[in-house]
């Protein structure tokens, strides 16, 4: 089968890999000059299934009001003048109750855990290297309330069979020795020992080369104008004066998927702007061993071989990609506060990217009402965490194979009022 994949970020490239390994003739189309040039270029570097959680959570609406007046707020909203933004925010607010939060987090963890296992299998099969580490993730709490609130997420982890450690402040240095100097600022942490880290861009670029060697065609510097459709199927992709045809089409354009699908399929994917700093390491002993997540500022600090990646924050501001100095100051403040000796901050590279976010935090993966159009988009801040699982899942669905995990509640159909998902199995049963 001939398959066209739109998008060469980590989600598009992993989709191409799994589909080509299944025997399909795959072509990837992207406007950029190479893979992983936009959202996948400089993300936080975390592969953290247990921390997969929607931004739409109980208490977020009130917190958002308080954050409006805080210099280092993790979330900011500026109206972009579109009705779509208002509708998306309303849908997000409707997911901010406990029932929706637990439901959304449960399916996100299910896919993320599966994806981490798919990555392990891929790594063993190919030997791909991407400055990866398997040292776990440590979520840091600065208040007693944050420490107490961790019990809510622990319930989901236990149901998913995800191992964890709830640590008091005095024990944080056991897993991250550099935190010994700042333990007095913290109340404790939640550690997930099975989480991983790695350079998403490096992984995507190297996997793209492997995919190309396996027969995948990459069409870079090729802007897509529109999808061509008739009745219940897509019959081509218009790129300038060329129409590229295939038997099946996969939408993996991230934040740009919504506009490309306008008039074809309605998906609630909106850009969530984030920032990162990439800092050269000065004192290895003063840098993190693996990756930490600051719960107060929603910022991750991740160790690569010779660099520290600091990433986070969320701005609901449309497609604005301006680099704002106050956001850099927030990233610098957090890394200086926790790892003051770790890196040469003055030499840091400042970056911003647009994460494709759904109102419920769960990506949109699966079929559409068009019999040859498939979706793999809307992964938000978890594209790196969920990419391999989403690619394998999509390949299985397209081939008519039964996937290893329940998947019907990942499709765009879940936004229909009459949608009733099948009851998921316990998550650990899918990847033991």
From Swiss-Prot:
Q: Give the GO terms filed under biological process for this record.
A: D-alanine catabolic process
Main role?
Oxidative deamination of D-amino acids.
Q: Name one GO molecular function term.
A: D-amino-acid dehydrogenase activity
Swiss-Prot/TrEMBL catalytic activity: a D-alpha-amino acid + A + H2O = a 2-oxocarboxylate + AH2 + NH4(+)
Q: What is its EC number?
A: 1.4.99.-
Protein family (similarity comment):
Belongs to the DadA oxidoreductase family.
Q: What is this protein called?
A: D-amino acid dehydrogenase
Note the HAMAP family from the entry.
DadA (MF_01202)
Q: Top-level EC class, please? A: oxidoreductase
Sorted alphabetically, which InterPro entries does this protein's record hold? Answer: DadA, FAD-dep_OxRdtase, FAD/NAD-bd_sf
Q: Which domain of life is it from?
A: Bacteria
Sorted alphabetically, which keywords does the UniProt record give? Cell inner membrane, Cell membrane, FAD, Flavoprotein, Membrane, Oxidoreductase
């Amino acid at each position: 089968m001939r398959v066209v994949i739109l998008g060469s970020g980590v989600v598009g490239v992993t989709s191409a890999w799994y589909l080509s390994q299944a025997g399909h003739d795959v072509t990837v189309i992207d406007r950029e000059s190479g893979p992983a040039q936009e959202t996948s270029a400089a993300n936080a570097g975390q592969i953290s299934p247990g921390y997969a959680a929607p931004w739409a959570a109980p208490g977020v609406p009130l917190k958002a009001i308080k954050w409006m007046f805080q210099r280092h707020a993790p979330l900011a909203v500026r109206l972009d003048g579109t009705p779509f933004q208002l509708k998306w925010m309303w849908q997000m607010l409707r997911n901010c109750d406990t029932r929706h939060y637990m439901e959304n987090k449960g399916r996100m963890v299910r896919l993320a855990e599966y994806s981490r296992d798919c990555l392990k299998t891929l790594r063993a099969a190919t030997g791909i290297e991407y400055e990866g580490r398997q040292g776990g993730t440590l979520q840091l709490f600065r208040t007693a309330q944050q420490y107490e609130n961790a019990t809510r997420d622990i319930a989901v982890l236990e149901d998913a069979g995800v191992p964890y450690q709830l640590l008091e402040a005095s024990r944080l240095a056991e897993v991250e020795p550099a935190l010994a100097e700042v333990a007095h600022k913290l109340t404790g942490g939640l550690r997930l020992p099975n989480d991983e880290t790695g350079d998403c861009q490096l992984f995507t670029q190297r996997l793209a080369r492997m995919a190309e060697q396996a027969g995948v065609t990459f069409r870079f510097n090729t802007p897509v104008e529109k999808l061509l459709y008739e009745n219940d199927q897509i019959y081509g992709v218009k790129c300038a004066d060329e129409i590229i045809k295939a038997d099946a089409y996969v939408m993996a354009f991230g934040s740009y998927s919504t506009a490309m699908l306008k008039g074809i399929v309605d998906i609630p994917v909106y850009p969530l702007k984030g920032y990162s700093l990439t800092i050269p390491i000065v004192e290895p002993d003063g840098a993190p061993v693996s990756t930490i997540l600051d719960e107060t500022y929603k910022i991750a600090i991740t160790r690569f071989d010779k660099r520290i990646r600091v990433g986070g924050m969320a701005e609901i501001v449309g497609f604005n990609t301006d680099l704002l100095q106050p956001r850099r100051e927030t990233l610098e403040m957090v890394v200086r506060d926790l790892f003051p000796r770790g890196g040469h901050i003055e030499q840091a590279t400042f970056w911003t990217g647009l994460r494709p976010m759904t109102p419920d935090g769960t990506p949109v993966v699966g079929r559409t009402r068009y019999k040859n159009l498939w979706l793999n988009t809307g992964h938000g801040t978890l594209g790196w965490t969920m990419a391999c699982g989403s690619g394998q899942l999509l390949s299985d669905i397209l081939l008519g194979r039964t996937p290893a995990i329940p998947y019907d509640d990942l499709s765009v159909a879940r936004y229909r009022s009459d949608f009733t998902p099948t009851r998921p199995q316990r998550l650990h049963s899918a990847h033991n």
